[in-house]
C-alpha cells in the first residue's frame, strides 16, 4: 500500500531506454486489465507518441498455471537480452519478484524437493542472483554499448524485510528503494524512505556533498524523534534549525510531483544546479533564535524552492527564482 505500482508506472514514463520489458507475475486479474487499458493511453514524454510503442508487457495472473507464473521473469529477461544484442538500452521492471518466488515454492513442493526457509526452495538465493546478474552493459561487435537494467519489486508479507525473498534480493542488487507506508500516509511522494534506502552507484552530484546532506537528514530525524518526547519547548534553537534543515531537504529534494510535466523528471544538469543551491542553504548558519521565526523562515524557503521546481530549466524565470532563493536565505545567514 506504499505505491509500488504507481512508482513503477512513473519510472516507465520518465526513463530513457529504447525498449521496456514488463513482466507481471501473479498479478490480480483486475490489476492486469487496468494496465492493459491504461498503457495504450499513456503518452511517452520524450516522443509524444504512445508509450506502448516501446513497451512489451508479459502478464500472468495469480489464477494461471504455476509453470507460466514461474516462466514470466525468464521470458522477459530473454526478450530484454535480445533487444540489448540489437544495440538498445532496455529497462526491465519485474512486478513482483515475491510472487515469482512463491511460484517457485509451489513448483518445488510439487517436485517434493527438500524445502529451505519458509518452505522456499533451497536454491532460492542462487536463482534470484542468476536473474539479476543477467543485467548489465555489453560492448557489441560494432563497438556500440547496449544495456539491460533490471528493477524488481518485492512485496514482503507484513512489511517484514527479514523474509527470505527480500534478504536474497538485497544481497545481489546494487540499489534499494525502500517504500514506506508511513511516508505514503504523510503524502510524501515518491514514498521512498531516505533512511532505509541505499545505492552502491555514484550519483550525478558530488558524493561528498551528498554524504554531508545525508548527515543533516539523519540528525534532523533524531531531533524529530526527541521532539516527540520533550516537545518543541525542550529543544534548543540550534537543534530546531537542524530539524528544519532536514525537513527542507526532504520536502524540496527527495519529493517530486509526478503530475507536473517539469517536476516529474529532472535532467542531471538541473539536479546538480538545484542541489548546489540547496547545499549552500543547508550548510549556512542562521541568526535566528525564536522558534516561530525559524519555522516561518524555513516554510518560506520551502515555498520558494517548490516554485523553482515548476520553472523550465535555463529559462529567465528559472534564473530569476534561483537569484530570489539565494538572496532570501543569505539575508538571514551569518558568516
Where do the model's predicted regions map?
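C-terminal non-catalytic accessory extensions
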Residues: 313-335
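P-loop NTPase catalytic core
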Residues: 1-304, 314-318
